[in-house]
């Protein structure tokens, strides 16, 4: 199975990246194909509501912005999508917001490309505002039919300077548990789908 972690922070090697990789580690250990994708720092224009995606239905955005369509292709191919963002004025980064708006609309325009996938939000925060950023990501997931698993708590990690989040032991435990939960849930969904397919063949 495939899991993709998308980093919405423009600061490479920063706290958001650290958290995302903590989630991916148990998935890799469970035999999943995992991939880390850097979106923060790339030029992704905001959605212009041109609805070109409803006309073409090719799972792509008609705007030729850098990086989005490649990222969308990876999201569609994944069984689990983990989106990470720093907290900017109590919300997600500009790149993450553009990704959410584009991908959510393209998914809907193409009949629900994200429906039935697993999705998780991960947030790096210095002090406050992380809950709102967490909600912003989950709003897109829940409106797209994505299955959002819980963990030991919500999914923030606290820190400002690069690597500071590694001192947040509770966050580390939570991210590890989140990765393990995604692995378990993915296997359960996969097994259920196989049983349904086998039943259809017998019928």
Which positions does each model-derived feature cover?
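Glycine-rich phosphate/pyrophosphate-binding loop and the adjoining helix
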Residues: 1, 29-30, 70, 147-203
């Amino acid at each position: 199975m495939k899991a993709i972690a998308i980093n919405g922070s423009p600061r490479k090697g920063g706290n958001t990246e650290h958290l995302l990789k903590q989630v991916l580690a148990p998935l890799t250990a469970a035999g999943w194909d995992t991939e880390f994708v850097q979106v923060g720092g790339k030029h992704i224009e905001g959605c212009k509501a041109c609805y070109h995606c409803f006309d073409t239905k090719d799972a792509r955005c008609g705007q030729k912005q850098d990086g989005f369509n490649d990222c969308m292709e990876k999201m569609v191919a994944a069984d689990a999508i983990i989106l990470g963002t720093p907290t900017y004025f109590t919300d997600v980064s500009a790149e993450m917001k553009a990704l959410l708006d584009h991908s959510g609309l393209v998914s809907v325009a193409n009949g629900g490309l994200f429906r039935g996938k697993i999705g998780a939000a991960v947030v790096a925060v210095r002090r406050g505002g992380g809950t709102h950023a967490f909600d912003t990501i989950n709003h897109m997931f829940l409106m797209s039919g994505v299955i959002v698993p819980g963990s030991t708590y919500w999914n923030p990690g606290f820190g400002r300077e690069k690597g500071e989040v590694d001192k947040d032991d509770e966050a580390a435990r939570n991210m590890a548990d989140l990765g393990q939960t995604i692995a378990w849930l993915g296997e359960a969904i996969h097994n259920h789908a196989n049983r349904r397919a086998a039943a259809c063949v017998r019928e």
